[in-house]
């Protein structure tokens, strides 16, 4: 009996150990996701505050200053206000499409953050097809906008949804061709491999110098994908009131508001990863890997700081562009995408392919 009881206790202890391992495994799955979401939310709040301050400076007026020190909590105050507003629905609209549209737009953008390397070995999902996954997922967002426009049963919303779909298709193709050129240079579709391929010569090893034409096209296409001025045709206030957002209020309108800044942040991060060397130093022959080998925490922190510094540099350019340039007409926007950017990006891809073949 004593041997039997001992065996039972041993088996129970092993069962408890296995269950604890499963619990710890689940915890370690959700902890990185939690910190990533927390960082994304913080980044969006900072972007909103920066845009308000930069726009105030360009327009020579006083920006937000009452909600927290220097108005840094203004975005949080706006979010709380939208959270408590009534969530109205159009009486003759398509309720399922109207409700699902904002969620599709936000979720498709959030999933793209999983393949962003913020520092060395600091990435949620290091996939061999990371760039391809981002392009595939980002193509889903316009479907949510089109569903929102159609489900609102409003002519302005529907026109805004159609414009969003047309604009996304027009600029997704040149953007994809630029990304393929970078993949050819790096011989990989992994975001980590692309960053490491730029780490040899510091500032001079960036893809910005090897792909200057692709960088400019990617920059323009990214602004168009984010629907920022001068490419904000889907929600042009003078023409469509608020475009596909016209019938939305409360938290659903807030989701669209957050989605626009999430898209701007992810585009800036991909500019950093693809063209500006990611987490690598700008100084030649000084690698972040050396710091990482000496002290992992310090090296990772420096890598995050470098990545965010480059990202917010592009964000500043995007915000300044919004408050500087006038809006294009719809025909000008489509002509720019199909007749100008697409042929140049295709020629850039063919030229890159030729150089890679001759260098073998």
Swiss-Prot record:
TM spans (from-to): 27-47, 98-118, 129-149, 248-268, 269-289, 297-317, 340-360
InterPro entries linked to this entry: NADH_UbQ_OxRdtase_su1/FPO, NADH_UbQ_OxRdtase_su1_CS
This protein's UniProt keywords: Chloroplast, Membrane, NAD, NADP, Plastid, Plastoquinone, Quinone, Thylakoid, Translocase, Transmembrane, Transmembrane helix
Top-rank taxon: Eukaryota
Recorded GO CC terms: chloroplast thylakoid membrane
Recorded topology in the membrane: Multi-pass membrane protein
This enzyme's EC code(s): 7.1.1.-
Keyword Chloroplast carried by entry: yes
Catalysis: reaction(s): a plastoquinone + NADH + (n+1) H(+)(in) = a plastoquinol + NAD(+) + n H(+)(out); a plastoquinone + NADPH + (n+1) H(+)(in) = a plastoquinol + NADP(+) + n H(+)(out)
Entry keyword annotation includes Plastid: yes
Compartments, as annotated in UniProt: Plastid, Chloroplast thylakoid membrane
A Pfam family of this chain: NADHdh
GO MF annotations in UniProt: NADH dehydrogenase activity; oxidoreductase activity, acting on NAD(P)H, quinone or similar compound as acceptor; quinone binding
Enzyme class, UniProt record, top EC level: translocase
GO terms classed as biological process: aerobic respiration; photosynthesis, light reaction
Alphabetized HAMAP family for the sequence: NDH1_NuoH
Function according to Swiss-Prot or TrEMBL: NDH shuttles electrons from NAD(P)H:plastoquinone, via FMN and iron-sulfur (Fe-S) centers, to quinones in the photosynthetic chain and possibly in a chloroplast respiratory chain. The immediate electron acceptor for the enzyme in this species is believed to be plastoquinone. Couples the redox reaction to proton translocation, and thus conserves the redox energy in a proton gradient.
Family to which the UniProt record says this protein belongs: Belongs to the complex I subunit 1 family.
Subunit-level organization: NDH is composed of at least 16 different subunits, 5 of which are encoded in the nucleus.
Protein name, UniProt field: NAD(P)H-quinone oxidoreductase subunit 1, chloroplastic
Organism of origin: Capsella bursa-pastoris
């Amino acid at each position: 009996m004593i041997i039997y009881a001992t065996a039972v206790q041993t088996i129970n202890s092993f069962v408890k150990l296995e269950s604890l391992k499963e619990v710890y495994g689940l915890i370690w799955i959700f902890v990185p996701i939690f910190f990533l979401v927390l960082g994304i939310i913080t980044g969006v709040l900072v972007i909103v505050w920066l845009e308000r301050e930069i726009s105030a400076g360009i327009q020579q007026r006083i920006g937000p200053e009452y909600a927290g020190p220097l108005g840094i909590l203004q975005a949080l105050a706006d979010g709380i206000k939208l959270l408590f507003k009534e969530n109205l629905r159009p009486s003759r609209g398509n309720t399922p499409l109207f409700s699902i549209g904002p969620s599709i737009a936000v979720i498709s953008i959030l999933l793209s953050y999983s393949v962003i390397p913020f520092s060395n070995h600091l990435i949620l999902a290091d996939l061999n097809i990371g760039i391809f996954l981002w392009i595939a997922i980002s193509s889903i967002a316009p479907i949510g906008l089109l569903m929102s426009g159609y489900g609102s049963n409003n002519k302005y919303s529907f026109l805004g949804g159609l414009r969003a779909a047309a604009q996304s298709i027009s600029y997704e193709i040149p953007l994809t061709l630029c990304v393929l050129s970078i993949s050819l240079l790096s011989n990989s579709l992994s975001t980590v491999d692309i960053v490491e391929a730029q780490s040899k010569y510091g500032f001079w090893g960036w893809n910005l110098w090897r792909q200057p034409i692709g960088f400019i096209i990617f920059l323009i296409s990214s602004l168009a994908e984010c629907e920022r001025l001068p490419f904000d045709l889907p929600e042009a206030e003078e023409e469509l009131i608020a475009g596909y957002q016209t019938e939305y209020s409360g938290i659903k309108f807030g989701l669209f508001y957050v989605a626009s800044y999430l898209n701007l942040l992810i585009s800036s991060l991909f500019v950093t990863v693809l063209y500006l060397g990611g987490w690598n130093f700008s100084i030649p022959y000084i690698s972040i890997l050396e710091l990482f080998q000496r002290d992992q925490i310090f090296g990772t922190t420096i890598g995050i700081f470098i990545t965010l510094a480059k990202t917010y540099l592009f964000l500043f350019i995007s915000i300044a562009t919004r408050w500087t340039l006038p809006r294009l007409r719809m025909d000008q926007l489509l002509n720019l995408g199909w007749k100008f950017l697409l042929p140049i990006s295709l020629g850039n891809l063919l030229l890159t392919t030729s150089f890679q073949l001759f260098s073998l």
